[in-house]
Amino acid sequence: MDGVEADRGGRVAVNEDLTVGDKDNVYIIGDMINLNKLPGLAQVAMQGGAHAAKLIAAKTDEESTADEKEPFDYFDKGTMAIINRFNAVAKIGKTELHGLIPWLMWLGVHGAYLSGIRNRAFAVAEWMINVFSSLSLIHI
């Protein structure tokens, strides 16, 4: 896009409301934003998308009293990462966990965000096969 500067990592500096420069109808979300050193994580993208959608809806609704320039306020829900089978790490607030419990938490959180019963069923089947064998459906 003309007139938009990106940093060395390709991220675009955005205004506090996720708009770009003086373009109040262009929003950038996710790992493409450079705002307050936010990490390139899915939860930043999801919250940013919801925020941008709310502001766009406010602009299109003539009766809306919402602030069309409301700043994006990111809430860190925590971070999880799988290390290997039955082993993961999680940091939620100031609490740090490792081992089986965060591994099960990771499965639950990621399963909950899958859309559709078919996708969830396939993911659970894949995880169960991986738990009980070295065979993976991805390789079949």
Regions found by a protein language model. Give the residues of each.
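FAD-site-proximal beta/loop scaffold in flavoenzymes
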Residues: M1-A50, K54-A58
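C-terminal, flexible cofactor-proximal segment of oxidoreductases
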Residues: K54-I138
